[in-house]
Structure formats: structure tokens, C-alpha cells
Amino acid sequence: MPVDSLVGKTPESSAGIHGWGAYVPVYRIPTREIARVWGWPDHQWKALDVYEKAVGGVDEDSTTMGVEAARNAIARARVDPASIGAVFFGSESKPYAVKPSATIIAEALGITPVTMASDLEFACRAASEGMRASIGLVASGVVGYTLVVGSDTAQASPGDVLEFSASSGAAAFVIGPSKGAAAVFESSFTYVTDTPDFWRRGLKPYPSHGEGFTGEPAYFHHIESAVKGLFEKTGLSPGDFDYAIFHQPNGKFPVKVAKKLGFTMEQVKPGLVTPFIGNTYNASALLGLVKVLDVAKPGDRILVAPFGSGAGSDAYSLIVTDAIEEAKPLAQPLEYYLKRRIEIDYGVYAKIRGKLVVRKL
């Protein structure tokens, strides 16, 4: 469908992505190193299809990474930061329990003081909530532009299976009117239930997971339901999309859910990120979207389906416009951050991520 004929046909089509950006820390720890330290057999960690994960430095947290990703998004959007009317920050690993990170990001980028700013919560789907809210704010004319940031320095208990994948990274998007957007939203659909698959209680450093709930009842059920709901709402089918991106808790799940929904590996592979940097939680599916936007061509149709434990999934259909070609070179692509790496061992990883606790005798 030509973009001009799309605009105004759905509520979502009045909004689009003007800028996108990524940030991934330079440090990497191979999953084989984690397995070596804890004695995991090869077949268990290799089954996850995660080769190494990104590790935030001692001076990096979800907010600092969010600022870096947002700078790239704003550079591509070519908008005055002061014109951004709302900032949404989605994270499971905020540096403060009580103090918004969205205001820190807004202040650092010159967006404050005349703006809305909120930290959102819905496990790995929090940033996607911000994207859905942004579509409504922009399409209704309440604000001209919004900034959506998904960023995490994901936690995992030492020796837990989550430690193979829980990683660090950030993605950001400037959402604005469809005119001039690099990609226009065609439609969206959300599906949520109360499912106890993954949680972290207050004052606890590491999350818990109900292993029997993490697969079919949570991840697969919710993503499949959201995507099928989008198909029913729009009349689209897998063959109508050039790219398909799903939340990536590991390298295995997104490929499996894609096949179950009828997508091919050719549609999925360009957006896979987790095998190379691990699961960046709120940035997981969104970094996949960044990776695809870095290479997409005008007229391409993109499906993206983030997921958050607890549990829920959104499904979006976007159509790329001619404006994408001018925006691409204005910031570093995700591939730059994927290739920029310093390998570390478990000792360095444990030290910089605060896993070592020293007690005085």
C-alpha cells in the first residue's frame, strides 16, 4: 500500500517514526565463559542460541545508555529537542526506585522543562507501552513529537540460566506526525493477561521465574495472540510483510514463534540481535526494529511484536517511506555497536556488574 493512501485510513496512520537510535556497551562476555564458571553442560547453554552478551560498564546504567540511544534518534529525526512534548522511559533496571529516569534523559537532551515525562512499567514491554501511548498523543494532536526509550542493564542471579542472556543495551525512537516520517504506523494490537512467568519483588536484587509459565503460556501465547489479532484487524497475513521482529529472550524463541505464525527465516533473520548481544529486555525487540530500519527500503512493510512478562504483547505494522534514506546516515547504525567489542572474563563481568559483595570481618 502506498504511504500516501495509507495516511488517515487508521488512527495509527497519523503517526510515524521520525528517528531511531541504538546504544550497546562495548564489553562482551561469551556464554561459554559463564558456562565454564558454573559448570553448565554445553548442550544446555548452546540450546539458547546466544553466543555472547553485552555488559554495561561500571559507569553505565539504563539511563546513561538511554541518553546515548536517544541522541542518535533525535539526530535522525532532525527535530529541536525542545519540540518533544513527551518522554517515555521503559526499563526493568532503573537506577532509582523512587525518582524518574525520564526527567534525567529529558534534561540531558535539552527537552525540559515544557514536556510530559514518565517512567513506564510492564517488564520488557514497558517501552512498547510508551510507543502505543505516543501514537495516541501524536495522532490526537496533543503533542507534536514524543521520545520513547527502552533501556536495561538486565539482572540475573549468578549461576541461573538467565545469566546466559540477561544483558545491557538501549533503543530509542522519535515519534511524530506521519508527514515526513521514515516509517508510518499502519495498525497496532495489544493482548494482555495476568500470567506469573517472571517477577522481581521489591528490595530483591534478582528476578524469579516460573519456568513452566515462560514458554507456551507466556511468550508464545501472548505474541501469537497479538499478531493474530493484528492480522484479523487489518486483513494482513505473513506474506504481506518484508520483515518480522519479535521479542528476543534468547535466539531460539523468536525463530520458533515466527515459524508458528507462518513467517520465513528470510523475514526474521535481519532483525535478530540477541544471539550477538543477549537479551536487552526493554530494548530487545526494539533493537531488532532499529536493525531493520537501518537497512529497510521505501515501501517495505515491517511487523514488530514486543513482549513483557506478567504478561502482554503488542503487534505493530509499519510501512517505510522515502524519508528513510535521508535519515539513515545521520547516526551510527546498530551494526557499528555490534562490531565494537571488548571481550571480558567472568571475574571482570562480576566486578563491573556488582555481583561481588565484600564484607569486612
Curated annotation (Swiss-Prot):
Q: Which Pfam families match?
A: ACP_syn_III_C
The record's section on NCBIfam families has: HMG_CoA_syn_Arc (TIGR00748), PRK04262.1 (NF003274)
What InterPro entries does UniProt report for this protein, alphabetically? Answer: ACP_syn_III_C (IPR013747), HMG_CoA_Synthase (IPR004656), Thiolase-like (IPR016039)
Reactions catalysed, semicolon-separated, are: acetoacetyl-CoA + acetyl-CoA + H2O = (3S)-3-hydroxy-3-methylglutaryl-CoA + CoA + H(+)
The EC code for this enzyme is 2.3.3.10
Any one GO MF annotation of this record: acetyl-CoA C-acetyltransferase activity
For this entry, list what GO says about its biological process.
isopentenyl diphosphate biosynthetic process, mevalonate pathway; secondary metabolite biosynthetic process
Q: Has the keyword Acyltransferase been applied to this entry?
A: yes
- What is the protein's given name? Hydroxymethylglutaryl-CoA synthase
Top-level enzyme category: transferase
Q: How does it assemble?
A: Interacts with acetoacetyl-CoA thiolase that catalyzes the precedent step in the pathway and with a DUF35 protein. The acetoacetyl-CoA thiolase/HMG-CoA synthase complex channels the intermediate via a fused CoA-binding site, which allows for efficient coupling of the endergonic thiolase reaction with the exergonic HMGCS reaction.
Its keywords, alphabetically, are:
Acyltransferase, Isoprene biosynthesis, Transferase
Family statement drawn from the similarity comment of this UniProt entry: Belongs to the thiolase-like superfamily. Archaeal HMG-CoA synthase family.
Sites binding (3S)-3-hydroxy-3-methylglutaryl-CoA sit at 124, 165, 214, 247, 256, 279, 309
Q: Does the keyword Transferase apply?
A: yes
**Source organism:** Aeropyrum pernix (strain ATCC 700893 / DSM 11879 / JCM 9820 / NBRC 100138 / K1)
